[in-house]
Amino acid sequence: MAADQKTLLDDLTRRMDGALESLRRDFAGLRSGRASPALIEPVRVEAYGGEVPLTQVGSIAVPEARMLTVQVWDRSLVGAVERAIRDSGLGLNPAADGQTVRVPIPQLTEERRGELARTAGKYSENAKIAVRGVRRDGMDQTKAQEKKGDISQDDVKVWSDAIQKLTDQYVKRIDEMLAEKEREIKQV
């Protein structure tokens, strides 16, 4: 494998990893039946004259399978944390208990599970589109190098095959991540 090809594949791998990481973040925000700190980490709280991430005003814990707690560091922000979680659109109903905000995770209805599975499917399709876009960039770079005379037609074939193989690996990983997320969502 030529150094240029290795450099190109490393760049494409890095960019495809970015698409996978983005999918992981999207999936973390999808509520399943189990409690996970990632569910409420993106919530922003009105505090100190602006909006700050929940993780900057308290620590999130999972004391039980269907319960999250937020230990708020500044007692004056307990109400703001409770409001932010309630208004987050996640369908959660937090309750303040001293400096702790308890967040019970309700059982998902079958209809809601279906919606979440469809949303997960959309997220995975977006990740596949991103991976295919990276593949297209790689193929374009390969063809441009051939036009400049830097590589032969045989090299173009070898590089294109390597890029396609890399793309197939990432699409397979995305499908595996989707299957795992759907199992998690459907689990009662």
From Swiss-Prot:
InterPro entries from the UniProt entry: Ribosome_recyc_fac, Ribosome_recyc_fac_dom, RRF_sf
PANTHER family: MITOCHONDRIAL RIBOSOME RECYCLING FACTOR PSEUDO 1, RIBOSOME RECYCLING FACTOR
One cellular component term from this protein's GO annotations in UniProt: cytosol
Family of the protein in this entry: Belongs to the RRF family.
Protein name as it appears in the record: Ribosome-recycling factor
Biological process annotations from GO: cytoplasmic translational termination
One Pfam short name: RRF
Any one GO molecular-function label of the UniProt entry: ribosomal large subunit binding
Gene: frr
Species of the source: Gluconacetobacter diazotrophicus (strain ATCC 49037 / DSM 5601 / CCUG 37298 / CIP 103539 / LMG 7603 / PAl5)
Main location: cytoplasm
Keywords annotated in UniProt: Cytoplasm, Protein biosynthesis
Annotated transmembrane regions: none
UniProt keyword Cytoplasm present: yes
Subcellular location(s) per record: Cytoplasm
Top-level division of the source organism's lineage: Bacteria
Function: Responsible for the release of ribosomes from messenger RNA at the termination of protein biosynthesis. May increase the efficiency of translation by recycling ribosomes from one round of translation to another.
